[in-house]
Amino acid sequence: MRTQGIKPRIREILSKELPEELVKLLPKRWVRIGDVLLLPLRPELEPYKHRIAEVYAEVLGVKTVLRKGHIHGETRKPDYELLYGSDTVTVHVENGIKYKLDVAKIMFSPANVKERVRMAKVAKPDELVVDMFAGIGHLSLPIAVYGKAKVIAIEKDPYTFKFLVENIHLNKVEDRMSAYNMDNRDFPGENIADRILMGYVVRTHEFIPKALSIAKDGAIIHYHNTVPEKLMPREPFETFKRITKEYGYDVEKLNELKIKRYAPGVWHVVLDLRVFKS
């Protein structure tokens, strides 16, 4: 979320059209993904929402404005209201990587940028990396582009998968990154991965057994989950450790990072874990 004072031009235009008390409620924060703007609006601004969106679009130079909503469902679909424009497909460039997506239907969090940048540095060219929840290539494209590693990207949702394939071509990594449109639990590979990405935060623990079956002995798993602050730092490591033990594995925690606040009192975290067969 970008925070700053309202652009003087926005205030200048809308102060002539909105009551003074509503001008004070104009959003000072927004998210820009490519040339699409995600704009939070207070309920009091509802009667003017389309005009407000139009002015923000003109001043900030975007083609489409969506009202921020909630993320829901197994595949983390956003629920946004279209306020201005019509085309919600865009190309967002970050750290030299092109991410094409439909912002209205596919989640992309600029707040996770540090983790995407970090992924560009973790893998070696001789590694095989399996991304179990690839999305549009959020985490695995940096590995393929900068780490030069071989990547298998698995994405269940057909619409999101279409953009994943496009992004592989856009970033010219077809020679080392392949994509599979399936539930990762149906992926046939076993004991193949040097590194596994589990960039998912809805019941991620349910996918640990599949990750273990894909992993080589000594593989590194980047395990994402959400955890109440009061349970940190014991969780989510203890749950991961318990499940790996049930399947005959030991685990070593190499690193733990906070990604962002997910909800009041809840953090999105990532653990870097090395797993060994007992």
From Swiss-Prot:
Its BP terms in the Gene Ontology are: tRNA methylation; tRNA modification
Result of changing residue 183 to A: Decrease in activity
**Phenotype upon changing residue 155 to A:** Loss of activity
- Localization terms from the record: Cytoplasm
EC number(s) stated in the UniProt entry for this protein: 2.5.1.114
Keyword terms of this UniProt record: Cytoplasm, S-adenosyl-L-methionine, Transferase, tRNA processing
Tell me yes or no: is Nuclease among this UniProt entry's keywords. Answer: no
Main localization is: cytoplasm
Effect caused by changing residue 142 to A: Decrease in activity
Q: What class of enzyme is it?
A: transferase
Under the heading InterPro entries, the entry gives: MeTrfase_TRM5/TYW2 (IPR030382), SAM-dependent_MTases_sf (IPR029063), TRM5-TYW2-like_MTfase (IPR056743), TRM5/TYW2-like_N (IPR056744), TYW2_archaea (IPR030867)
Single GO MF annotation: tRNA methyltransferase activity
Q: Which residues bind S-adenosyl-L-methionine?
A: 109, 116, 155, 183-184
> Impact of changing residue 138 to A on the protein?
Decrease in activity
Q: Which is a Pfam family this sequence falls into?
A: TYW2_N_2
State the protein's purpose.
S-adenosyl-L-methionine-dependent transferase that acts as a component of the wyosine derivatives biosynthesis pathway. Catalyzes the transfer of the alpha-amino-alpha-carboxypropyl (acp) group from S-adenosyl-L-methionine to 4-demethylwyosine (imG-14), forming 7-aminocarboxypropyl-demethylwyosine (wybutosine-86) at position 37 of tRNA(Phe).
- What name does UniProt use for this protein? tRNA(Phe) (4-demethylwyosine(37)-C(7)) aminocarboxypropyltransferase
Q: What is the lineage of its organism?
A: Archaea, Methanobacteriati, Methanobacteriota, Thermococci, Thermococcales
Q: Which gene encodes it?
A: taw2
